[in-house]
Amino acid sequence: MSRMVDTMGDLLTARRHFDRAMTIKNGQGCVAALPEFVAATEADPSMADAWLGRIACGDRDLASLKQLNAHSEWLHRETTRIGRTLAAEVQLGPSIGITVTDASQVGLALSSALTIAGEYAKADALLANRELLDSWRNYQWHQLARAFLMYVTQRWPDVLSTAAEDLPPQAIVMPAVTASICALAAHAAAHLGQGRVALDWLDRVDVIGHSRSSGRFGADVLTAAIGPADIPLLVADLAYVRGMVYRQLHEEDKAQIWLSKATINGVLTDAAKEALADPNLRLIVTDERTIASRSDRWDASTAKSRDQLDDDNAAQRRGELLAEGRELLAKQVGLAAVKQAVSALEDQLEVRMMRLEHGLPVEGQTNHMLLVGPPGTGKTTTAEALGKIYAGMGIVRHPEIREVRRSDFCGHYIGESGPKTNELIEKSLGRIIFMDEFYSLIERHQDGTPDMIGMEAVNQLLVQLETHRFDFCFIGAGYEDQVDEFLTVNPGLAGRFNRKLRFESYSPVEIVEIGHRYATPRASQLDDAAREVFLDAVTTIRNYTTPSGQHGIDAMQNGRFARNVIERAEGFRDTRVVAQKRAGQPVSVQDLQIITATDIDAAIRSVCSDNRDMAAIVW
């Protein structure tokens, strides 16, 4: 009984303070009324109208808004009792405020306050409450509150998806809210590197007297027109983000113009001032994959770096990549010794990783290797297979090989090649670099000495190969004698490569098989006679020695010769088939596919005639 009396006494006390507060508010203003509203909530913490009065009179404490939300079911009890109304303006989003009069609006306002306070999970949970949508006016406010949560937490794709959601036809649309949502979406698109998309969102908002661009949109797209003095902070932000987007699009003149318009009462915003002072300042661009990698979805700092994401992706694909690399190598014609050497290399790498895990030394070992042999013998394809195998084993992050040449290492003047080589290697860590004709890194003077520009690159490469012996893989390729001679230009160069894979010239049977495999997916087919002619001709070529002492098949570049012959033979076949058709003879599907002995013979002679070293061959 005494507790009930106390409660009634508290309520009566609270009501006296509340009634006095309302009277003072109307007569003397909010500052004078606030202490009475505070006294009312102290007497009865459940008096929602008193909490609303506190907020209306300038109480910006998050705890007060939380109390109002907790007791919002009692809203209007006291104002109805005395026949009065009460409302509070509360910030919702970065630059505008919502007029709070009922429980659902309190919830929307609280979600924004929670976002500002960093209580993101609570804001998200509150916005999931469908009771906040008890009024058609609340739908667009809810959209802004959710976009704002995603904006503050830098979940840029979610900002865009929220901004793009269609509102119900009955929803009440407000220009200020539309403009605020468009501004957030423009920021999001810009941070995703989608400058044109950002401009599209910005163009939906007309600032009266400053810009008119919304007319290009259809009736199904929400647009807005706001006055420059209506919401100065929003107008300044629209100008700022447009300026930063133009900078992102490399239109600096436009960027300067719009950044200069990012003012409030004629004073540049801090962000605009900083951007105008530094033309290199740009918005930070990220991607959806990075955002999705966060361990805490609300904390951008918990996202993984690009290298970590690449590592994760490689780890997930390692089994596939290893299988792909092995299959690619296995599909190559011949190369038995190379395939065996790669298999042994896999074993060595696996043991090396286990030794490193247990702290055991791996002196003298490195990822770098040499592929030596005549052209067209599968060195580049083997390098591609090694890229997949290395990535599959976790030796490198990226399976794709990067083919380089002298110009990637060497500058035009002495002193440029060292830094250029360093930059190339630093950008290639976690990758495979492949350089065919490795020896072309230097150019020789008439007396045989190497050029200084090339040697500068060689000397710096030597350092990088040792420093990063496990951080990337450098594969040099070319003729063995020329590679060996090149390695002598610096005494330490040969020691940076602890494995050499030798590629032999293809046999005549292998050349014909390469031609067959090249023709099949092109829907071309050598008949038996064509294969015999091809085999005999390749045998003749292989037994031929050029004036420079080179085997004929090496001069014709082995596997490339087979592919060139097939392509040339298809041309002779096509000419033959067209003549057949023009003569009134039927052309079958088989006719369109078959390469005859005549076609292949003409193709071989034609391809060989392009090489002057083959001029003396006797067929």
Swiss-Prot record:
Keywords: ATP-binding, Cytoplasm, Nucleotide-binding
Compartments where located: Cytoplasm
Gene3D superfamilies: 1.10.8.60, P-loop containing nucleotide triphosphate hydrolases, Tetratricopeptide repeat domain
Annotated Gene Ontology cellular component terms: cytoplasm
Primary location group: cytoplasm
CDD domains with a match to the protein in the record: AAA
SMART domains reported in the protein's UniProt record: AAA
GO molecular function: ATP binding; ATP hydrolysis activity
Residues that hold ATP according to the record: 373-380
A Pfam match: AAA
Keyword flag tRNA-binding: no
Cross-referenced InterPro entries: AAA+_ATPase, AAA_lid_6, ATPase_AAA_core, CbxX/CfxQ, CbxX/CfxQ_RuBisCO_ESX, P-loop_NTPase, T7SS_EccA, T7SS_EccA1-like_N
SUPFAM superfamilies per the UniProt record, alphabetical: P-loop containing nucleoside triphosphate hydrolases
Annotated family: Belongs to the CbxX/CfxQ family.
Summary of subunit composition and partner proteins: Part of the ESX-2 / type VII secretion system (T7SS), which is composed of cytosolic and membrane components.
Known function: Part of an ESX-2 / type VII specialized secretion system (T7SS), which exports several proteins. May have ATPase activity and might provide energy for the export of ESX-2 substrates.
Name of the protein: ESX-2 secretion system protein EccA2
Source species of the chain: Mycobacterium bovis (strain ATCC BAA-935 / AF2122/97)
Gene name in the database record: eccA2
